[in-house]
Amino acid sequence: MGCTVSAEDKAAAERSRMIDRNLREDGEKAAREVKLLLLGAGESGKSTIVKQMKIIHEDGYSEEECRQYKAVVYSNTIQSIMAIIKAMGNLQIDFGDSSRADDARQLFALACTAEEQGIMPEDLANVIRRLWADHGVQACFNRSREYQLNDSAAYYLNDLERIARADYIPTQQDVLRTRVKTTGIVETHFTFKDLHFKMFDVGGQRSERKKWIHCFEGVTAIIFCVALSAYDLVLAEDEEMNRMHESMKLFDSICNNKWFTDTSIILFLNKKDLFEEKIVHSPLTICFPEYTGANKYDEAAGYIQSKFEDLNKRKDTKEIYTHFTCATDTKNVQFVFDAVTDVIIKNNLKDCGLF
């Protein structure tokens, strides 16, 4: 009699097994759901990373979606040349050819209507082409660290012939280069390596930061973007503040925040291509007066990496996963995101007791 297992005991054992199985299934499901928060100061490349996820994991932009970016490409191109011309006045740079002053006046007369209508009329394209070819305009462009200018300025202006054609349809690369300030929170979903990603792109300008906080709960990992090339620039919203210093301040507050004790922090030192071009003629001491190394890519980039990683106050328990990126280079982002995903899988399984 004592050795007989009662029906109640059998049922209880079965219930227990089901609960264990459900818990394990829930754990595995939780391990497959990834909430990624993209953080960083304004213009650090967060939105470009989101666009790359669409290209890499969601079959990219359709022809119709690319067409919808046409007006943004035109606006970015017009705004860029206008910013350079305005800066010439402030920096007291003359046109190489004095007749370009008439073109500048015409630019400002035509620009407003063109932007409102999302078009690039032939007369405006010709004006921009002549201005961009001027030696004085090029001299001002080479001093762009002294004023606010889109990173994509040269990309669009050098390709004006193609962009201004009547049958122009933006390419994926054109779309990647577009700049639209992110306001609020943009959510993207995709699946990769059997993981279901929810990626949140959050506006980086100071006025946007108060909107971040309610996104923080249950975050798997934070990708923090830094524009390496911003070491010699000031903020658009505060011309006294160096952009790299602002980025470091923000990273410090995120990395050492009690909310993120168990959150993987992935650091994207972005715009490495622009940094490599710039470091040769614009010394790192502009940002870090104590720097004594060479103004060469490897040494200077390594120094910036150590400055950010040294902000981590929990080095013994928290690792920062750093990658050098070029957000407009699809192959580079694909390679880096593959490595990031492997880290997330490992850490997720560990958290769920499955590793």
Curated annotation (Swiss-Prot):
Domain G-alpha stretches: 32-355
Binding residues for GTP: 40-47, 176-182, 201-205, 270-273, 327
Keywords carried by this UniProt record: Cell cycle, Cell division, Cell membrane, Cytoplasm, Cytoskeleton, GTP-binding, Lipoprotein, Magnesium, Membrane, Metal-binding, Myristate, Nucleotide-binding, Palmitate, Transducer
Chain intervals for the UniProt region annotation (G1 motif): 35-48
Coiled coil spans: none
Classification via SMART domains: G_alpha
Matching InterPro entries: Gprotein_alpha_I, Gprotein_alpha_su, GproteinA_insert, P-loop_NTPase
Annotated lipid attachment (S-palmitoyl cysteine): 3
Chief location of this protein within or outside the cell: cytoplasm
Residue numbers spanned by region G3 motif: 197-206
Record carries keyword Repeat: no
Residues that bind Mg(2+): 47, 182
Pfam families: G-alpha
GO molecular function: G protein-coupled receptor binding; G-protein beta/gamma-subunit complex binding; GTP binding; GTPase activity; metal ion binding
Location(s) in or outside the cell: Cytoplasm; Cytoplasm, Cytoskeleton, Microtubule organizing center, Centrosome; Cell membrane
Residue ranges, annotated region (G2 motif): 174-182
Entry's Gene Ontology BP terms: adenylate cyclase-inhibiting G protein-coupled receptor signaling pathway; cell division; G protein-coupled adenosine receptor signaling pathway; gamma-aminobutyric acid signaling pathway; positive regulation of cell population proliferation
Lipidation (N-myristoyl glycine): 2
Chain spans, region G4 motif: 266-273
Cellular component, GO annotation: centrosome; ciliary basal body; cytoplasm; cytosol; heterotrimeric G-protein complex; midbody; nucleoplasm; plasma membrane
Gene3D superfamilies with a match to the protein in the record: GI Alpha 1, domain 2-like, P-loop containing nucleotide triphosphate hydrolases
Protein family: Belongs to the G-alpha family. G(i/o/t/z) subfamily.
Subunit annotation: G proteins are composed of 3 units; alpha, beta and gamma. The alpha chain contains the guanine nucleotide binding site.
Function: Guanine nucleotide-binding proteins (G proteins) are involved as modulators or transducers in various transmembrane signaling systems. The G(i) proteins are involved in hormonal regulation of adenylate cyclase: they inhibit the cyclase in response to beta-adrenergic stimuli. May play a role in cell division.
The name this protein goes by in its record: Guanine nucleotide-binding protein G(i) subunit alpha-2
Species this chain originates from: Gallus gallus (Chicken)
